[in-house]
């Protein structure tokens, strides 16, 4: 069971495209390699760019499998799943940073790619299941994917 940070809302929801009815026809996809702690952007099955990431720590492992981007927010609001404390979007202590790309949910909690106020955590197993990225990297990636983009997470 995954209990990642809860994403409440966004101060600026972004819907870049409609989700394609044939998801696998999309030329852009992401592959997250948990053991290498890296996300790679593919375009027409060719690797275009790779970024270092933090992955879920023991007990909070990032789920593996095939997913799709279901949420994209700028300045996401975060609620601590244990205390209920809310941190507004854009706040320097917001653990999601300024960009959120959600790709997994159990109907209540979400897992996605996001920035971090702790750049030293990138490259480690440090999250509650999410994929942390350097803030400059998630900002770049945010504009290279869209709703419906395939996300493959491998061990």
Q: Where does each model-flagged region fall?
A:
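N-terminal pre-domains immediately preceding structured catalytic cores
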Residues: 1-155
């Amino acid at each position: 069971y995954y209990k990642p940070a809860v994403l409440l809302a966004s101060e600026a929801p972004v819907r870049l495209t409609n989700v394609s009815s044939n998801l696998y026809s999309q030329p852009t996809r992401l592959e997250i390699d948990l053991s290498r702690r890296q996300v790679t952007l593919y375009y027409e099955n060719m690797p275009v760019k790779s970024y270092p990431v933090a992955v879920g720590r023991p007990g909070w492992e990032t789920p593996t499998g095939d997913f799709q981007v279901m949420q994209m927010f700028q300045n996401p609001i975060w609620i601590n799943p244990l205390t209920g404390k809310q941190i507004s979007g854009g706040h320097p202590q917001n653990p999601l940073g300024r960009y959120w790309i959600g790709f997994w949910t159990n109907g209540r909690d979400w897992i996605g790619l996001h920035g971090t106020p702790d750049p030293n955590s990138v490259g480690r197993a440090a999250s509650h299941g999410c994929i942390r990225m350097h803030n400059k990297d998630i900002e770049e990636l945010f504009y290279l994917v869209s709703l419906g983009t395939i996300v493959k997470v491998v061990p």
